[in-house]
Curated annotation (Swiss-Prot):
Keywords: Cytoplasm, Lipopolysaccharide biosynthesis, Nucleotidyltransferase, Transferase. It is found in: Cytoplasm. Pathway: Nucleotide-sugar biosynthesis; CMP-3-deoxy-D-manno-octulosonate biosynthesis; CMP-3-deoxy-D-manno-octulosonate from 3-deoxy-D-manno-octulosonate and CTP: step 1/1; Bacterial outer membrane biogenesis; lipopolysaccharide biosynthesis. Signal peptide: none annotated. This is 3-deoxy-manno-octulosonate cytidylyltransferase. One of its GO terms (cellular component) is cytosol.
């Protein structure tokens, strides 16, 4: 199986300006993400950015980059432009690796790519881990997914789904025992043929209300398959505190990017379960 890892990277960030360029043990964060992705089975790791500084930082460290428009409404639209620039064939598989996840496990990248390759009826593959506390279940910033027995996504929501009617009848906010609640992890593998169609798909009501772009694919009849993993992966970088945590992990790790094992052990200690 062959696939491409694409890393969208925008410098604009409200909570952490110039986030892709933030230094982590001597290298920009986007380069650290690319190094992690390069440890996967990807045949190509490429950054898609609308920022000259990000492009220069990436290429100076030996990774290719493509310049994309700054006007894209979603990250998926940016991926669609990137695959067009790269000239990827419609049957190719692309994994969207978020540019703020310098602790991402290479095996997770391989896993979603393999899942899509194994499910020819699907256009998208992603992953989810068990929800383990009520606070996360009721947190609208934690996206939930419910799946069929075949692993196909039935719905994604910011609401607490599935709803435990009897356990929550009194208005309590609790995680009902045995509730099959899953936290969606925002790592996606796409078929290029789907990415080529995505910009032409009209936004539907579900996407507008939930503000979840994967619902656009589902509203238009596209199949998403979900790998259910046992535990949450290391959290990404959203705040200055997150950045400090990741910097500490890298500074404690051996001076080789191949030693992903130690980085993962350290990251597990700082995982906030998102």
């Amino acid at each position: 199986m062959s696939f491409v890892a694409l890393i969208p990277a925008r410098a604009a960030s409200i909570r952490l300006p110039d986030k892709p360029l933030a230094d982590i043990a001597g290298k920009p964060m986007v380069v650290r993400v690319a190094e992690r992705a390069a440890l996967s089975g990807a045949s190509l790791v490429c950054v898609a950015t609308d920022d000259t500084r990000v492009e220069r930082a990436v290429t100076e460290h030996g990774f290719p980059a493509v310049r994309t428009l700054s006007s894209h409404p979603t990250g998926t639209d940016r991926l669609a432009e990137a695959v067009r620039i790269l000239g990827l064939p419609g049957d190719a598989i692309v994994v969207n690796v978020q540019g703020d996840e310098p602790l991402i496990e290479p095996t997770l990248i391989d896993g979603v790519a393999q899942l899509l390759a194994d499910n020819p009826q699907a256009d998208i593959a992603t992953c989810a881990c068990p929800l383990t506390d009520a606070q996360a279940l009721f947190n609208p910033n934690v996206v939930k997914v419910v799946c069929g027995n075949d692993g196909r996504a039935l719905y994604f929501s910011r609401a607490p789904i599935p709803w435990a009617r009897d356990a929550l009848a009194g208005g309590e906010r609790m995680l009902a025992p045995g509730l099959p609640a899953w936290h969606h992890i925002g790592l996606y593998a796409y078929r290029v043929s789907f990415l080529q169609r995505f910009p032409t798909l009209a936004q539907g009501e579900l996407e507008r209300f939930e503000s979840l772009e994967q619902l656009r694919a589902m509203e238009h009849g596209h199949t998403i398959v979900v790998s259910r993993i046992s535990a949450a992966p290391a959290a990404g970088v959203d705040t200055p505190a997150d950045l400090d945590r990741v910097r500490a992990i890298y500074l404690q790790a051996p001076k080789t990017e191949a030693n992903q094992g130690l980085i993962q052990v350290q990251s597990d200690q700082g995982n906030d379960g998102r």
